[in-house]
């Protein structure tokens, strides 16, 4: 239930239109590692795709991602935590994190307000993601900020 500007309750529905995924990995493919809710996903191994199965996952802070690996989050999966390559410039190429699911830092404390305090040299693990080399190819990938399209 939402509220109008004047505080009167209203019923709302939000619909997000996303294109069908044409490159969704198959659970039967060799090299696809299936991560069940509650399981600690492996950060390395002979797999090429880490597939988070439906449900709620908690990967913690700074789950390591690696070059030439794919991380798939389907629409019925929520992954709490952060992903990074531990500042290794040689291990940060051709990483694909995709799907219609949710990758959220909601369960993590803000590093400036955590109790006990998070050491300053660990704050980088909590920073927002930096994406380079993204191709925008349809309206669902369009960013709108202050009524300006990017």
Show the residue positions of the predicted features.
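Extracellular/periplasmic carbohydrate-active domains that bind, remodel
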Residues: 1-150
């Amino acid at each position: 239930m939402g509220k109008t500007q004047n505080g009167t309750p209203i019923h709302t529905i939000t619909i997000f239109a996303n294109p069908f995924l044409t490159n969704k990995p198959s659970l039967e493919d060799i090299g696809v590692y299936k991560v069940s809710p509650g399981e600690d996903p492996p950060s390395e191994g002979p797999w090429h795709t880490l597939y988070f199965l439906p449900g709620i996952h908690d990967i913690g802070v700074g789950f390591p991602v690696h070059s030439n690996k794919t991380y798939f989050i389907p629409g019925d999966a929520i992954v709490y935590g952060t992903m990074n390559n531990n500042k290794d410039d040689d291990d940060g190429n051709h990483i694909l994190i995709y799907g219609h699911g949710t990758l959220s830092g909601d369960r993590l404390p803000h590093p400036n307000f955590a109790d006990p305090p998070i050491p300053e040299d660990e704050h980088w693990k909590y920073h927002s993601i930096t994406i380079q080399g993204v191709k925008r190819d349809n309206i669902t990938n369009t960013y709108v900020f202050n009524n300006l399209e990017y």
